Amino acid sequence: MASHDYLKKILTARVYDVAFETELEPARNLSARLRNPVYLKREDNQPVFSFKLRGAYNKMAHIPADALARGVITASAGNHAQGVAFSAARMGVKAVIVVPVTTPQVKVDAVRAHGGPGVEVIQAGESYSDAYAHALKVQEERGLTFVHPFDDPYVIAGQGTIAMEILRQHQGPIHAIFVPIGGGGLAAGVAAYVKAVRPEIKVIGVQAEDSCAMAQSLQAGKRVELAEVGLFADGTAVKLVGEETFRLCKEYLDGVVTVDTDALCAAIKDVFQDTRSVLEPSGALAVAGAKLYAEREGIENQTLVAVTSGANMNFDRMRFVAERAEVGEAREAVFAVTIPEERGSFKRFCSLVGDRNVTEFNYRIADAQSAHIFVGVQIRRRGESADIAANFESHGFKTADLTHDELSKEHIRYMVGGRSPLALDERLFRFEFPERPGALMKFLSSMAPDWNISLFHYRNQGADYSSILVGLQVPQADHAEFERFLAALGYPYVEESANPAYRLFLS
């Protein structure tokens, strides 16, 4: 089917019984930073918080009445499932929804809420492709009509109405429209419409690095099935793209860019700062891709449109997003630093951090000769981490830059510590101090040099006050003097030396 055939299907698509024309909203802060006008096509504001409602309803509106009466079935990573459930409830038909077991609970609950008693939810497999295989078996057993999440002309046309709205809402020059890609339905529909109406506008697909089936397929010239897919951007975790979507993307798409998890987290934060809305990872793909493209191509004063495709975010994922956004936006650098285990070296190292805001500081005495510190600091530009590491090295502190090391960011930062045979006469304290620039360095400066620091843990949580865990080696003979030191210190504290968890894991 050529683009002009899809043009007719898109123009006559039945989506507005359930969906509405979403805003094309300027992202003012992001535009200023990228030096390019950026507009967000706010599909995250649809009734199911995702664009998927368009294609699902359009497909179901074209199913013959007798087949529709028997019921429909679909497989989905979550958002299409909500679209089918919502449409089924509106049409008064039964629907079976198969979702992967990895689907966020917020999406599973929403499917049931939108569909009501007429919807049956089955969880099967770890990815969309696994759920799809199971759905085909159920379809054959029950004689249901399958509503494909992306590889169907009516679904593609329904998603293509987004492009129709964008070009009507912004009739001036547009350099590129960025769309997320899982199976390719949205990208295929948008590209087919744009190339039929405004062929000078680029359409760029965006995928997660660990779920880039379309990028690999276009590079190979044929559909490539991935052995595994990453699940952070669960809404686009597709192992094999559709036949029709691949054909259309191969013909009309101008390219695909891939982004990592940190870039996705940074994009979620960017959209929040401009709109006060929280996108899901897949919903932020287009924004992350637009940022990467603008930086890579070195463009300025070019209008960029990003489709914010969904906002079905699990609340408990937000902490991870907040932490990783700093690295993705080149605002945090992470290092492992080795310092000599001698009096004054800890404080000397801290002085090198200077006026930079410390985001994390983990240390545990482990060796009589040297100590290893895990430290995070805020940075202002890409590449600054290399300068900081070089400065540490020039002052005799062996340094490893871990800013882009996945193991360190995901696990090691939480595992620094443990029992130490060298932590003799250790007493453990939680200190509280106001969270402001320079406050950590001021606290460290107030630590008396008479007692060795054997443990130190700090993480900036974004609160107005922070808690620091400090272990100090205080011989029995020094207890009276140490108590006077604590009283004069001026920071609220709680001694945790008798804490059961400390006794089990650290003492």
Swiss-Prot record:
Residues 333-404, 427-498 form the ACT-like domain. The modification N6-(pyridoxal phosphate)lysine is found at K52. It comes from the Bacteria. Its cofactor is pyridoxal 5'-phosphate. GO terms for biological process: isoleucine biosynthetic process; L-serine catabolic process; threonine catabolic process; threonine metabolic process. Its EC number is 4.3.1.19. It catalyses: L-threonine = 2-oxobutanoate + NH4(+). Pyridoxal 5'-phosphate binds at N79, G182, G183, G184, G185, L186, S309. CDD domains: ACT_ThrD-I_1 (cd04906), ACT_ThrD-I_2 (cd04907), Thr-dehyd (cd01562). It holds the Pfam family Thr_dehydrat_C. Homotetramer. This is L-threonine dehydratase biosynthetic IlvA. It comes from Burkholderia multivorans (strain ATCC 17616 / 249).
